[in-house]
Every structure is written in C-alpha cells, then in structure tokens.
C-alpha cells in the first residue's frame, strides 16, 4: 500500500466472509454441499492443502475469479439489454468482494485481508501462522452456516469461475500447471502486468486513493480492459 494512504478498517460482513470461505473450500477440494461429517473428512490432508496457500495467493486467485465472473456478467448484461423485462439478476462477485485495493503484491480484498487475524472471523477456518486451518468442532453446523450465508447465485458464480480457470494455464510459465495450482510468485507477476491503468495507477499514483473497486465503478471501461489483459495471459 502506498505510504500515507488512509486506512479505514471495517468489519467484514457475513455474506462476504461466507463467500470467501466457500471460495477457499472450492480451491482445496472441500465440497460443502456434500456435508461430510468430521469422521469422513481427511482433516490432515485438507490442512496440508490449506498450508500451501498464503493469504496473498488467495487474494490473487480471488481477484482472478472476480474478473472471470465479471466477463460472464458483461456477456449476460448484453443479453439482458435485448430482454429489458428481465431485471432480477446478481451483480456478480465484484459486488460481493467490493473492496479491492492496490497493495504491494497486487489487488487485495481489504475487508477479508485486514480482518483475517480477528478471532471468530471465519466459521470453517482459523488463521494460524499465516495460513488457514480447518476447524474440527461442529463442522456440519459450520459448513451449513457458510452455505446459508452464501447465496446460490454467488455459489454458482464461484463454481463457474473455478470451472473456467481450472484448465487455464499461464503463458509466462511452461510448467503445464493450471493457474489455480500456481504458487504465489507467478500469480503476483500476473496481477502486476494487467492493465497499466488499474493496479499500477492505483498503487504508484494513488488513483482513487488506491481503491480498485471504486475505480471500476467510476470507469467501467477499465474493468473491461483488465479482463482483456487477464485473458491475454492465459492459454
């Protein structure tokens, strides 16, 4: 974050927190909809998987999920323009994760990131030693709480973005891994090399006081540009 930028931390709302937990569960292969009991869970395996993810890695993937979903939303909105009577629709993941700011390592959803150390922030996870770990107590109730607080539209948006990205690879790396399997460093590199008018403008020149989400609201064409630059990084 640019030195001197005001930092107004607010508590993260339940819907956003639950959506983030659903997103994390999706990444590590924990299917909450199947509602497995603790006995059926391989907790050690899941925690080993969780240990591979820094919060920076989550933030970059979350941003890429939001861009992928926004591309779908733009397409759907164009179709709705042809069908004006169809007005009930979800605004997409960028309306849920609506507080991205430009940090040193790329876009960060501030409400999630800055509250991660708060006890009780997450239902399914604790945050220990820089990593999320699965809570073992009352797992079924906690899983159901996440599902109840994450709308079906948001679940579908996360599922859809996951399905689209799981077979996408990064052009900058020849290792053949899906973008979802890449480590933190290449994800940060991608985030730094999207539209020059988004993260660089917000981070280095304090555009919109570093608030990427606000930038997208005020200059919608920059969201389109960011999506196109992200798509150009994939194969």
Region spans (language model):
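Domain-edge interaction signal
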Residues: 1-235
């Amino acid at each position: 974050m640019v030195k001197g930028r005001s930092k107004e931390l607010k508590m993260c709302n339940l819907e956003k927190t639950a959506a983030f937990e659903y997103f994390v569960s999706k990444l590590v292969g924990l299917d909450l909809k199947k509602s497995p009991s603790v006995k059926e869970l391989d907790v050690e395996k899941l925690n080993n998987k969780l240990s591979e993810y820094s919060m920076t890695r989550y933030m970059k993937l979350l941003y890429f999920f939001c861009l992928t979903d926004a591309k779908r939303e733009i397409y759907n909105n164009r179709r709705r323009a042809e069908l004006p009577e169809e007005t009930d629709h979800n605004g997409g993941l960028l309306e849920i994760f609506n507080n991205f700011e430009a940090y040193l390592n790329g876009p960060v959803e501030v409400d999630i990131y800055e509250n991660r150390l708060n006890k009780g922030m997450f239902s399914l996870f604790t945050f220990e030693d820089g990593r999320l770990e699965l809570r073992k107590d009352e797992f079924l109730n906690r899983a159901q709480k996440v599902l109840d607080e994450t709308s079906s539209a948001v679940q579908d948006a996360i599922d859809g973005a996951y399905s689209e990205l799981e077979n996408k690879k990064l052009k900058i790396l020849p290792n053949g891994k899906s973008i979802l399997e890449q480590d933190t460093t290449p994800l940060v590199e991608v985030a730094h090399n999207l539209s020059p008018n988004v993260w660089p403008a917000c981070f280095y020149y304090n555009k919109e006081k570093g608030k990427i989400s606000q930038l997208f609201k005020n200059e919608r064409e920059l969201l389109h540009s960011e999506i196109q630059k992200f798509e150009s990084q994939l194969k």
